[in-house]
Amino acid sequence: MFTDKETHRKPFPTWAHLLHSEPSKQFVFGNWKMNKTLTEAQTFLKSFLSSDILSNPQIITGIIPPFTLLSACQQAVSDSPIFLGAQTTHEADSGAFTGEISAPMLKDIGVDFVLIGHSERRHIFHEQNPVLAEKAAAAIHSGMIPVLCIGETLEEQESGATQDILLNQLTIGLSKLPEQASFILAYEPVWAIGTGKVAHPDLVQETHAFCRKTIASLFSKDIAERTPILYGGSVKADNARSLSLCPDVNGLLVGGASLSSENFLSIIQQIDIP
């Protein structure tokens, strides 16, 4: 058992309700990447799930463990307000793809959402926008929420190409989704991930506003207004509040700082709710 009986909480509403509810909710997702053994995950969750910080219904929290921990983590968080995410998925439902995991498999073990196109998938594993569009569609068709990750490199940012890069990633990455699809967007400038460099809140707001305007042009103003747009890139407790104060920032995608329950809870505690 990961948790004691008294730490169990009533589950939060469904994703459909959350993504159509008032825009004041903030989302905070912790991406564990390729970290933690089962024992380490047990230790983390025992501490994490016992915190009263998680009781705020205006903050929607999710953890994104590696594939090997998804089933165990799902059992641990099933009676809590925590949602479960996967770090990627394959675009096909099944087949001869050794080492891959499909969206129906993830949904079957209780995964709620899945990252699509995290910068490390794009730049280390060379995942391209057309394939990511298929992965996002696969997540939707399997009943999960895709979290499309977009972002520019330092060279692209310094050359003034940020909006062109993001427009291309959004236009192609969202092209296979149904017109009324529910999805989440995560802006993660590549130059800020794991580097300790954080985009200035003014730049974050400007970029998020551009992304929302683009979503409106691709889908509708209504979908743009209700689509959560998260920021990711060296998020820590000392910058979480200033980032969450940006009008078009609806939450944070946290990397290394989410590996410690104490640090992750400190970030959640800093989130500003209007």
UniProtKB/Swiss-Prot annotation:
Q: What is this protein called?
A: Triosephosphate isomerase
Per the entry, what this protein does is: Involved in the gluconeogenesis. Catalyzes stereospecifically the conversion of dihydroxyacetone phosphate (DHAP) to D-glyceraldehyde-3-phosphate (G3P).
Protein EC: 5.3.1.1
Q: Any idea which residues are catalytic in this one?
A: H118, E188
Q: What is its main location?
A: cytoplasm
Organism of origin is: Chlamydia trachomatis serovar L2 (strain ATCC VR-902B / DSM 19102 / 434/Bu)
Upper lineage: Bacteria, Pseudomonadati, Chlamydiota, Chlamydiia, Chlamydiales
Please provide one cellular component term from the Gene Ontology annotations of this protein.
cytosol
Q: Which family does it belong to?
A: Belongs to the triosephosphate isomerase family.
